[in-house]
Amino acid sequence: MAEENPGALAANVPYLGVDELGASVIVEPGLEGSNAGGRTLPAAAIKFADLTESGSESGDNEAEEPVSAGPDNANAIGEPGTSASAAEENGTVERNSPPPNCAICLSRCRRKCFTDSCMHQFCFKCLCEWSKIKPECPLCKQPFRTIIHNVRTLDDYDRYPVQTTSPVPTENPSLRYHIVRRPRYTPLVQNQAVIVNDIEAAIAAGAAGEDVLSAAEVAAGRRSYSRFEPYRSELMNYYQHDQDASTSGSLSQLWRRYVYDRKLYALPVSDSVTGHFREWSARFYRNNPAQIHRLMPWIHRDIMCLLRNAAHSVNTVMTLMSDLLPMTSLLGPTFRRRLSPYLGERTSHFIHELFNFARSPYDINGYDHVVQYSARVAEEVEVDLLDMVETQSSNGDDLNLEVGDSDADAINAGFSPDWSPPRVRPSTSVIVTNPGATHSFSVTMASDGSELPGISIRRTTNVGSQTVAINLSMRRPAAVASEEPEVIEIDDGDAAANAEVAAINDGSNTSRRHAGATLPVTAHIELESSSSSGDEDECVFVLELKPPHMRTPEQVSLDSNSDSDVVFVNEQHEAAPDAIAENRSTQSPLDLASRDQGLFMGPSTSGAAANRGKNWKLVMAQTRRLDQLRTLRSIRSKKSRRSSMPARSDSGSSPSSCSSSSFHFSSSSDEDSSDSSTTNSEPPKKKSRKRVANNKRSKKESIGKRTSRKRKAKDQNMEMLEQQQISQKKPQRQPESSSDSPSSSDDESGGDSSESSGQPNTNNNKSSSDSDDDSAVNMQLSALRATLKAEATLEDRKPVKLELQLPDDDQAGPLHSRMTPSPREDNEPGCSAPKRRRSCSHSNQSSQSASLASSSTATSSSAPLSSFAWGAAGFSGDPLMRGHPAMEEHDIANSLIELSTLTQPVNIGLFNEHYNSAENSMGMLSNTLCDSPQTLAADDANLENYFDTDADPEASRERDAYSLEAAIDVVGESELQIAEDTATATEEQDEEDEEDEDQEEDDQEEEKAAEEEEEEEEDDDDSDNHDENDENQGLLPY
């Protein structure tokens, strides 16, 4: 179908050069079969006229086609719209290269044709089939609607419309929008994208008698129709009657005028690689003055466009800009207020354009290549949120929104009559602009002329959401209020673009537009409308923010232990540490010990009380800490006593010792005693180092060794006594007295000791003349033992603690054994039974030791027993005193002498041959026992040695036979307690030493300790050790 084009849109375009006009042809479809008023093709299209004159489709005459090679080669590689060289007047030009082939079939073009959007040539048949699939140029990808073929002259050609299958929308040419992209070769603006409203163009074309495009053609390809040509024609027609346009200096300034006049808003331009924006703050410009020089050319170009007819000087505004940029933020109210006197209503638009250029990574030329614009409608109600952002940042409680009505007369002041917009518009446009915001929102508004529900704006930021209530009151004229409801939706079409939103409605249809707009807070806008008439729409925004304590908390914690639903966690945690600190400072150790009883109580009804029950771990740790402190205090006190006792014993004058105790058997010679004391003084140092090495071993191994050693000590104890007595050439102990006097208790103990050792009881004492006195003393001691035992059993009292402390000048005798600390009392039942069994197993040995001590004392004393005659009247009220006072005095004295010997083995010098030592000890006893019972109780509290309350079977037999009880097993109990004290103090002291010593020394000591332990085990077998740590106690060599 052949059609003729009557349009001539480019006929009245001013001359801009052959290259520009040759590519600016827009071929519009004309009426069918009409040649009147047809549009003239550009001069470059004359080549197609010469080529297709014959109308042949065979392509035989292609060799004679006068085609210029330059444009064809350029078109073959896809360069759109390059102009061809002008044909000569005779129309014959020789070509230097063959014509290009068809890009579709790759062969010679048959019946050449081209599209209405570009001048690329193809086969007519190939391009028709290609358009059925996709109406785009195969080379430059520009969409087209018609195919131009069979060109005879510039005004005589055929057109083939492209077929389309898209649905036909409702015809509304006054509301059409299309996207226009400008080609790269254009010197005006390169690769700029705009959204143009062609309402005015369509009306102007209809008024001029031109045909309006059908809706089907718009749907087919009008939305992207001709990247540059429709816009360029519109631009030239827009300023064709403007005298300033010809003297504007450059097309760039003309374009900037068009941007401001047509309300085109630039979209943000970021770095294509990183997506970041350039810094644009006032501080940045103060620190980098060179960045201001980058902005000045762009500012100067726009200021000249805006102030071309104004009385203000461009230099004045440029000076003001250089002062404001380093001092004031671009989006601040101060910057806007200083520019308003010069730029007037276009101040906000200028700030928007300057802001986008300032944060773009390009200079002025690069920015013009890549920037894209978004259009606004001419008549609109503009809600500018720029001030709201600044005010919100400075004052969080006040939100100010500037609302202004754009004046249609001012907008259309520079319009030519051909491009004048319609005078009456049934729709209302709402534009929300906020280029500095970063979050989106949506608005939905409906109005029917009465009370309206309002506009809802909701926005949620990445940090958190905030609710703002804004009341919007709008008064409209009655004519506007009578229209149908309209819906305006402001959505986040492109949040990063800071795009504006436009919603345009006609009287019958409702439409929605989407773009990027943002709010710094979540807002709720209520719209109130009244029918009162007015010249302008008035919008009043009122902000209402709830105080912080009335807002919904971001985090709510629920506690199951509390009766209330909401628990304020912060208040709880602040109160709990104060309560704990107060309890620690006010409670005594007894209160802390009794505090464990209420640790595991049920959940409380209050949150604070429920949290206190969780402090039981702290209470337990506090209790353990107090126990450790008490243990350390007791150990230190015992260490101080032990350190003072050797000092006192060194001042003694007796060089020899002939007595024997349950701990050691020493020889009677002075040399043996001095050697034993010397060797006894060395092992403690060696043993302390050995103990540190042994602590590295596991406890299981040490416990097993202790058990085996205890058993060996029990089994071989009696055998060692017998072997030692036989093997020794010299007597190791003094025999007991065998006098005929009634000393039944002492004879019985002597008999027991002889039976246990397997030897007959013989007397080798040289002082046999004093045996009678010795027997009397022994009888008194036995009576005292029986009395004490009976009293402890009847009254069920705690064992009495006894310890004798002699004056420094009265103590004598060398140190024969290593001192051991006294342990804490062990109240566990499992531990008391074995101790008592050991005490009973060695009762014979204790009796023998007591007999030896008594006989030694009787032998060494040359004075009568009247030296014990200290005042007994002071003890008449004592419950332990029984029988005749005189005999009880002697019994108590002798018994305490024996007890002091057994509990303090270092003071063995009390029972030697020297008479002076015995007399001094008697004097000390008289001074000690003359005190009141309260003094004795106080001494018992400080000393920690107790009698054994278990009944002695041998003592019960003696009590039946002689009415006097045998000796109380004080020796075994004291040994056990001393051993326990030794174990406890040694372990705790070793733990402290272990932390101080280095790891390398411990490894070396382990190897040495292994060898020393083997030697020590042999020595331990010869010793009489009844303690759990008996392997650590020094032994005397035999």
From Swiss-Prot:
Domain of life per record: Eukaryota
Described function: Functions as a ubiquitin-protein E3 ligase. Negatively regulates the transcriptional repressor hairy/hry by promoting its ubiquitination and subsequent degradation. Also directs the nuclear organization of the gypsy chromatin insulator. Chromatin insulators are regulatory elements which establish independent domains of transcriptional activity within eukaryotic genomes. Insulators have two defining properties; they can block the communication between an enhancer and a promoter when placed between them, and can also buffer transgenes from position effect variegation (PEV).
Name of the gene: Topors
Compositionally skewed regions (Basic and acidic residues) per UniProt: 792-801
This protein's name: E3 ubiquitin-protein ligase Topors
SMART domains (UniProt xref): RING (SM00184)
Predominant localisation class: nucleus
Residues with the Phosphothreonine modification: 820
Basic residues biased stretches: 633-642, 686-699
Catalytic activity: S-ubiquitinyl-[E2 ubiquitin-conjugating enzyme]-L-cysteine + [acceptor protein]-L-lysine = [E2 ubiquitin-conjugating enzyme]-L-cysteine + N(6)-ubiquitinyl-[acceptor protein]-L-lysine
Entry keyword set: Chromatin regulator, Chromosome, Metal-binding, Nucleus, Phosphoprotein, Transcription, Transcription regulation, Transferase, Ubl conjugation pathway, Zinc, Zinc-finger
Entry's EC annotation: 2.3.2.27
Subunit structure: Interacts with hairy/hry, p53 and Top1. Interacts with the gypsy chromatin insulator complex, composed of Cp190, mod(mdg4) and su(Hw); interacts directly with mod(mdg4) and su(Hw). Interacts with Lam/lamin.
Recorded GO MF terms: lamin binding; SUMO transferase activity; ubiquitin protein ligase activity; zinc ion binding
Record InterPro entries: Znf_C3HC4_RING-type (IPR018957), Znf_RING (IPR001841), Znf_RING/FYVE/PHD (IPR013083), Znf_RING_CS (IPR017907)
Region listing for Interaction with hairy/hry, in residue ranges: 495-682
GO CC annotation, single: nucleus
Matches recorded under SUPFAM superfamilies: RING/U-box
